[in-house]
Amino acid sequence: MIKKSFISVISHEEKEKNRGSVTFQILSLTNRIRKLSSHLELHRKDYLSQRGLRKILGKRQRMLSYLSKNNRIRYKELINQLDIRESKTR
């Protein structure tokens, strides 16, 4: 597992105040996604972890779409900081 790939964009004081904010939740989901991805590189046949990864990806995608509708500027900044592709609109 690679521990250096985890992100700490938000300072420690902001973490204590804003645990429920959308940006903090997206950040924590991204860390969980990267942790599970590195696990699945070693254990390719761990199908329960693959299912969990898909669930987390869907949850992050819904939160990103919510953020893009409500605060487009913060959405763009967060995508650039986390190095995530922009979602396709349907």
Curated annotation (Swiss-Prot):
Pfam families tied to this protein: Ribosomal_S15
Highest taxon listed in the record's lineage: Eukaryota
UniProt keyword annotations, A-Z: Chloroplast, Plastid, Ribonucleoprotein, Ribosomal protein
One GO biological process term: translation
GO-annotated cellular components: chloroplast; ribonucleoprotein complex; ribosome
GO molecular function: structural constituent of ribosome
Location in or out of the cell: Plastid, Chloroplast
Residues passing through the membrane, by range: none
InterPro entries in the record: Ribosomal_uS15, Ribosomal_uS15_bac-type, uS15_NS1_RNA-bd_sf
Signal peptide extent: none
Disulphide-bridged cysteine pairs: none
Keyword Ribosomal protein: yes
Subunit structure: Part of the 30S ribosomal subunit.
Entry similarity comment: Belongs to the universal ribosomal protein uS15 family.
Protein name: Small ribosomal subunit protein uS15c
Protein's organism: Morus indica (Mulberry)
Lineage, uppermost ranks: Eukaryota, Viridiplantae, Streptophyta, Embryophyta, Tracheophyta
Gene it is expressed from: rps15
